[in-house]
Amino acid sequence: KLESFIQEHGVESVAWVQMIITCNTNGGQPVSMANIRAVAEICKKYGITYVADCARCFENAYFIKEREEGYQDKDIREIAKEMFSYFDIAFMSIKKDGLVNVGGMFACRDKDLYDRAWPDNMNYEGHVTYGGLAGRDLEAIAVGLYEGSEYRYLKGRIGQVQYLGERLDEFGVPYVRPVGGNGVYIDARKFYPDIEPGHFPGLCLAADLYMKAGIRVSELGASAFSYKDEQGVIHYPEIDLVRIAISRRVYTNSHMDVIAEALGELYQSGSPNFKGMDKSDWYGATTHFTSNYTPMWK
């Protein structure tokens, strides 16, 4: 598919190829080393820059170790090192696999690109040696990256996400299978089949779940990924997901039980509080974060 796209549209129309490991918008699914390597070969063939969004790179390395032949006996950091060997650029929100509350990272192989990038960082964030972060945050990042790449930690974290999936199975709750690394993604349209995408079934589920059990989740569907074309026609994604992201080192399996039971009751009742949501504001590219919605009460 990738090579066909490049051949159809031309190399000059492709600024770069970006791989998200793991992918936050499709259920937190991992990318195999074979896939990463194959895309690298295509990018090299056509001279296209290969970029990694690697916020959850250690979770991805864990799945490679668990599932991909030839990696069972390799260390998480060793696997991560091989992953990064295929990319030209990597950027990371360190708040994810770095286990901290602030910080990010940009790395590249091209010295010229680096020399052009870091002055902007200094203008907007801080000097390249600290990026506007306090010393304590830099120390936390150093520790977090080390602990976040420990196999025992990853096994426990991802095991908790898998436990939530197993509990949801008991209630027949529909979600993206298999569960990924950072959370469980619920199929909102199967909760509310009568609510059209334009009335945001994912947001309705998020609101219902919060009112029922005080559980806060994120919609990744019509609100996040719909867009207006040049003619003003709104296009909606094929699925409406609600992400139940599991915070690191915070919850016990008892909390997972509460989530599963609340979702199970909502799914089995088949009676949402809403007929849908109306978007009262539209803010273009940032709409998912900044728009306001009005509930259409039953």
Task: Give names to the regions the model predicted.
Residues 1-173, 196:
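Conserved PLP-enzyme active-site core in the AAT-like
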Residues 24, 96-97, 110-113, 146-148, ...:
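Short, glycine-/Ser/Thr-/acidic-enriched flexible segments
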Residues 38, 42-45, 163, 167-171, ...:
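Generic non-transmembrane alpha-helical segments
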Residues 108-116, 136, 211-238:
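Flexible glycine/proline-rich, aromatic-decorated loop/lid segments
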Residues 115, 193-201, 249-258:
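Short, conserved charged micro-motifs
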Residues 148, 212, 224-298:
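PLP-dependent enzyme catalytic core of the Aspartate aminotransferase-like
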Residues 161, 189-216, 230-237:
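Active-site loop ensemble at the mouth of alpha/beta enzyme cores that anchors a bound cofactor
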Residues 161-162, 176-188:
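Conserved glycine-rich beta-strand-loop-beta hairpin in the small C-terminal domain of fold type I
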